[in-house]
């Protein structure tokens, strides 16, 4: 085939891809001066946050008790600048998608800085709750040799730390950015935690791959999940146009001290009571009483 024939094929593809009907709902109209969220910068934000939350494990390995104040100060300053940039991008993306602004204003820049500083003020509390997650992972796994091994190696800690960062940003009203952050962890670990889920302290996921925690899930303290667990929705109420109604509670509530073993599927707005145990490979769509132990029915001989 001659180069001219190739040119014709390429030109035809360009024309078809440029038809408005072909990109309906898939095209973001970028406006001059509008920043866009950057996955690369958000990855740097996560790494900086981890270096602050887990000093010595991430970031500068030469940090010690004499220099920790300096290193955290430097990282906080970098984090603030990057957060301001990305939060602004999220705010502009959200408002432009809704058709409410053309170019991000000084007011939005000030709001981005306020939200960034508010997020940074939450880091001490975030470290405290992540410390309980590390403790739960260590205490719950006889194969764990140390807290350091848990922090360095366990995919659950990466996924949970991303979730806790994203959840705080979502609680502050930052659009889009929180979802990107949790999906980064999803891609890396296979653990899918929606940033809107509410999760208490001492939370751990053993092994982790294939876990799904839906947006309206509520998880109490000292809860342990194993690989392949789904906390999902049983059904979706529809609006007049037949589309799912968004924002309504549709995922399970797990009370304190619940254990859910591998590949269990728990669906709908049901309650798994305090101290209950859900066995592996079970489909649960009804409330489970406190202290109950739900396992597969044995096959009849």
Predicted features along the sequence, with ranges:
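Structural signal for interior beta-strand "rungs" in well-ordered beta-sheet cores
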Residues: 185-301
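Terminal amphipathic alpha-helical/low-complexity segments used for targeting or macromolecular assembly
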Residues: 1-180
